[in-house]
């Protein structure tokens, strides 16, 4: 594989300790790809809100990622960023926030992830509407899908393409959907959209989702 400027910089400067371990890990990754192996990437925490998609999406398009294991937060927050990026609020001094400051953010429907606030109405509620429609249809038809498959269907349908606020090439989930990569999402229920699903199962108007929920789990 040809070396770009970043690889050249790292090989020139990253010689010892954890820096050297980074080089060794990258070389091992490269060797596995050259040998024809498939690579599963595990995404922890909320890296989608840290805009990991800028680099991750390109890796997926270049066939350097073949499967993904991620948190429910990573799954949904890539789509939140895709449709509501312009409404996000950054808090550089988040360590100095008082309880009053936190309450003010809550009152304005901002959900803080370290130094970045996700807007509830422009991101979460917009995606909720599209997902609920798909969940209800699946329950009515007796269809069973993994969590990521509902997002794949949403992204590939074009239903939200007119609402994109970033370059779609920076969405790793869209890139994964276009490749139909398998995604494992342990603990999906511990996410915003997972809680949306549970709340609609509990709501009287969506009692028919409960049978679908039982089959799903």
Model-predicted segments: where are they?
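N-terminal glycine-rich anion-binding loop in soluble enzyme alpha/beta folds
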Residues: 1-26, 30-33
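Short acidic, glycine/serine/threonine-rich loops at helix termini
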Residues: 51-54, 79-85, 195-198
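A generic, well-ordered mixed alpha/beta core segment in the N-terminal half of proteins
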Residues: 60-124
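Thiamine diphosphate
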Residues: 46-59, 68
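An interfacial alpha-helical scaffold signature
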Residues: 20-25, 29-30, 175-205
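Ligand-binding beta-strand-loop-alpha-helix segment within the catalytic cores
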Residues: 101-192
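Short glycine-rich or small-residue beta-strand-to-loop segments that form or flank ligand, phosphate
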Residues: 38-44, 68-70
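Conserved small/polar residues in nucleotide/adenosyl-binding loops
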Residues: 207-216
């Amino acid at each position: 594989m040809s070396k770009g400027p970043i690889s050249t910089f790292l090989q020139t400067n990253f010689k010892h300790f954890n820096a050297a371990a980074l080089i060794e890990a990258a070389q091992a990754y490269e060797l596995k790809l050259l040998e024809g192996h498939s690579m599963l990437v595990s995404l922890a925490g909320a890296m989608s809100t840290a805009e990991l998609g800028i680099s991750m999406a390109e890796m997926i398009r270049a066939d350097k990622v073949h499967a993904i294991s991620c948190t429910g937060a990573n799954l949904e927050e890539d789509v939140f960023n895709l449709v509501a990026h312009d409404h996000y609020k950054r808090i550089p001094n988040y360590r100095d926030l008082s309880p009053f400051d936190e309450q003010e953010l809550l009152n304005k429907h901002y959900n803080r992830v370290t130094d970045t606030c996700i807007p509830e109405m422009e991101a979460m509620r917009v995606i909720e509407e599209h997902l609920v429609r798909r969940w209800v249809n699946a329950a009515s038809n007796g269809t069973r899908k993994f969590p990521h498959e509902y997002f794949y269907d949403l992204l590939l349908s074009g239903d939200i393409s007119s609402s994109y606020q970033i370059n779609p090439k920076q969405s790793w989930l869209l890139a994964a959907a276009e490749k139909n990569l398998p995604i494992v999402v342990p603990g999906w229920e511990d996410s915003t959209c997972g809680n949306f699903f549970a709340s609609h199962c509990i709501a009287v108007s969506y009692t028919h989702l409960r049978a679908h929920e039982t089959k799903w789990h």
